[in-house]
Swiss-Prot record:
Name of this protein: Capsid protein VP2
Known function: This extremely basic protein may tightly bind to SSV1 DNA. Essential for virus function.
Protein's cellular compartments: Virion
Organism per entry: Sulfolobus spindle-shape virus 1 (SSV1)
GO cellular component annotations of the record: viral capsid
A GO MF label: DNA binding
The UniProt record lists the keyword DNA-binding: yes
Amino acid sequence: MKWVQKAIKRPGRVHRYLMRLYGKRAFTKDGDIKASYLDKAIKHVKKAKIPKEKKRSLLSALLLAKRLKRMHRK
């Protein structure tokens, strides 16, 4: 799964963003991200007034995190 390392340009970005928005409640005791908070963050980014390029890259990072979370379950 070398493509994962290449796809993740800024490791920890989603974690830091969720921590800033929601604090510790966005994570399980193990430190994993709760899926519901990923969905909330995606909605927040879509509505936020962020510069277009930053919005797109943050949204793609969140969507990749959601996709990887789904892959991990299987």
